[in-house]
Amino acid sequence: MPSFDIVSEFDKHEASNAVDQANREIQTRFDFRGVTASFTLEGETVTLEAEVDFQLKQMLDVLRNKLIARGIDARCMDIKEPVTSGVRAHQEVVLKQGLEQPECKDIVKRLKEAKLKVQAQIQGDKVRVTGKKRDELQQAIALLKSDAGPELALQYTNFRD
């Protein structure tokens, strides 16, 4: 039976490249001349540091653009509130990887409500979808792409016939 997996992942190496490119861009931008600002990537957390709050917003836009250019969906970013202390401001951005249990249940529920002839199973941090025909699986993908919402960055992997 044909099947595929629904996951929410990103390439960590591409994320590292995006952070490096963002650092290079803010070092050469005119509006960041003479300003101490940087991005640091530790695990799945990117820390933005600048002198004032509005620079963090500009840096966040730069980071978002670089992630998109490197093929990482911007919806995987969990943006924390900026923290200002004295002459420094910093903000953390967590790059989310893997589907949580409520998100998996929501995907399974949407597939069942659509009355497609597919079965969905939760397997850890991914959802396996099986069906008798490849066309049914393509309908399931189209359904999830149309109403996945702005909060989920979904990828479809491990196609089997």
From Swiss-Prot:
Gene3D superfamilies: 3.30.70.860, YajQ-like, domain 2. NCBIfam families: PRK05412.1 (NF003819). This is Nucleotide-binding protein Csal_2524. It comes from Chromohalobacter salexigens (strain ATCC BAA-138 / DSM 3043 / CIP 106854 / NCIMB 13768 / 1H11). SUPFAM superfamilies: YajQ-like. One of its GO terms (cellular component) is cytosol. PANTHER family: UPF0234 PROTEIN YAJQ (PTHR30476:SF0). Pfam families: DUF520. The keyword Nucleotide-binding applies.
